[in-house]
């Protein structure tokens, strides 16, 4: 873009004012077209990643809010609080990336995650804690694979970098929930 701007200014120096205005107008149109093409060029696999990551993160938040209310285990409540904080931060970052790329992220839980939330909400005590831990282990293992796959194979640089940055946090969550599981 800098070279394009320089070229437009160089052309302006060589031509009359009306020709320069035409060059400016053409350069602006070309730049706008390039920017629009850049947002439309996000690969479908990257869009699917963003959708899955956002949906999974949203589910972790909702499940963990429920755990903060219903669990009787302090370690689980602390883990759930960490989930809400970490997944909210990651979700906010992903939302900015998605907005810049015109990717529409889900605003509600998908059917699978909604069923998990509904089923979990019916449990209490030790049954609740065991079910929550089981879901966290399964979902985080899936999330780690999702992040690692995108970090290794993603085509969009921003989403690839996001996945690479989030993967170690997901691994830390796996380690923490497995430690809680081992102590139950």
What is each residue range found by the language model?
Residues 1-184:
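His/Met- and acidic-residue-enriched segments that coordinate or traffic transition-metal cofactors
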